[in-house]
C-alpha cells in the first residue's frame, strides 16, 4: 500500500470503464457517500477517500502549513488520481471538496471529464456585490465557540447544518464524524474554508460543471449556485433540489441520489 493510499484510506470499488471520484466535505469522511456508492459500482469504477484532517485519518499526517489553503487538498486529489492511474474522472465534490475540485481541474484539466458539485460556495462571506450568507462577526463567534468547548459546539452545529428533525439519523451521523476530528485541526480547517475566496478562479475552469444544491441550506444561499453558473469558465448547469440542509446526500438520499445519478450519467446538452 502506497503512502497516498494509506494516508487517505483510498478505496477503489466497481469495475466500469469510467471512473467516478467521490470527495467529502468538512466534518465528514467517505462514509457520507454510503447511499450513493451502491448505485454506481455496477457501471463505474468508484474512488472514495478521506480528506486529510478527517477523523478517520492519522492526525500526525496533518500539515497545518500545507492545509492552510485549499491548494494543498487539490494536490492531494491529483496525487490520488495519479497513484491509481486514473486517466480522466467524473469528480463529485461536496461542499469544500467542490472547490478543491475546481482548483485541481484548473491545474490538471486532463484529469477531469466533468465536475458535479453539491452544496458548493466560492466564498462564504458577504462582500460589496456578493451575498455569501455570512458576516465576519458571525464567523468569529463560531470560531470562539469551537475553541471554548468543541464537543458542545459539535452538538449545536450539526443540527443547524443538516436541518430537519433533531433526532434524525443524519444529524447523529454528522455529529459522530464531526466529533471524530481533532479539535485544533477542525478549527484550522473550518477557518481556512470560511475565510477563503475563490471567485477569481471560476473563469479559469474549463471542464463542464453540474451545480446541485438544496433549496434551503444554512451555509450556501441559492444565489451562490447562480453566481457559480454565471462565472464558471466552462459550460455549467444548476439544479436546486426541494431538500433542506448542507448534506442532502445524507439527510435526503431518496431525493438526492436520483439527481446525482442523472448528472453523473448525462452530460450537459450543448
From Swiss-Prot:
Keywords, in A-Z order: Cytoplasm, Hydrolase, Nucleus
Family that this chain belongs to: Belongs to the AB hydrolase superfamily.
Highest taxon in the source lineage: Eukaryota
Active site per database record: 95 (nucleophile), 217, 246
Gene3D superfamilies given in the database record: alpha/beta hydrolase
Keyword hit for Cytoplasm: yes
Main localization category: nucleus
InterPro entries, alphabetized: AB_hydrolase_1 (IPR000073), AB_hydrolase_fold (IPR029058)
Record localization: Nucleus; Cytoplasm
A GO term from the CC aspect: nucleus
The protein's name: Karrikin insensitive 2 receptor CA
Tissue note: Expressed in stigma.
Function of the molecule: Hydrolase which may be involved in plant olfaction during volatile communication.
UniProt-listed Enzyme Commission number(s): 3.1.-.-
Organism: Petunia hybrida
Amino acid at each position: 500500500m502506497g503512502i497516498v493510499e494509506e494516508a487517505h484510506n483510498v478505496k477503489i470499488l466497481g469495475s466500469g470503464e469510467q471512473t467516478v471520484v467521490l470527495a467529502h466535505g468538512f466534518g465528514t469522511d467517505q462514509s457520507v457517500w454510503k447511499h450513493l456508492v451502491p448505485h454506481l459500482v455496477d457501471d463505474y469504477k468508484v474512488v472514495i477517500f478521506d480528506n486529510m484532517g478527517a477523523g478517520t485519518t492519522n492526525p500526525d499526517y496533518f500539515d497545518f502549513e500545507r492545509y492552510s489553503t485549499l491548494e494543498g487538498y487539490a494536490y492531494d486529489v491529483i496525487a490520488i488520481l495519479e497513484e491509481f492511474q486514473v486517466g480522466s474522472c467524473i469528480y463529485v465534490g461536496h461542499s469544500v471538496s467542490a472547490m478543491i475540485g475546481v482548483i485541481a481541474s484548473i491545474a490538471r484539466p486532463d484529469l477531469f471529464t466533468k465536475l458535479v458539485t453539491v452544496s458548493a460556495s466560492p466564498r462564504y462571506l458577504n462582500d460589496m456585490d456578493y451575498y455569501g450568507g455570512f458576516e465576519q462577526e458571525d464567523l468569529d463567534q463560531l470560531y470562539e465557540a469551537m475553541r471554548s468547548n468543541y464537543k458542545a459546539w459539535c452538538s449545536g452545529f450539526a443540527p443547524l447544518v443538516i436541518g430537519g428533525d433533531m433526532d434524525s439519523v443524519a444529524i447523529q451521523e454528522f455529529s459522530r464524524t464531526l466529533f471524530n476530528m481533532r479539535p485544533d485541526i477542525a478549527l484550522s480547517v473550518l477557518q481556512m474554508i470560511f475565510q477563503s475566496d475563490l471567485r477569481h478562479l471560476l473563469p479559469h475552469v474549463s471542464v463542464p460543471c453540474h451545480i446541485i444544491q438544496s433549496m434551503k441550506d444554512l451555509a450556501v444561499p441559492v444565489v451562490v449556485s447562480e453566481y457559480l453558473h454565471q462565472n464558471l469558465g466552462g459550460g455549467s448547469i444548476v439544479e436546486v433540489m426541494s431538500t433542506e440542509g448542507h448534506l442532502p446526500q445524507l439527510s435526503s438520499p431518496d431525493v438526492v441520489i436520483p439527481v446525482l445519478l442523472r448528472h453523473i450519467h448525462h452530460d450537459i446538452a450543448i
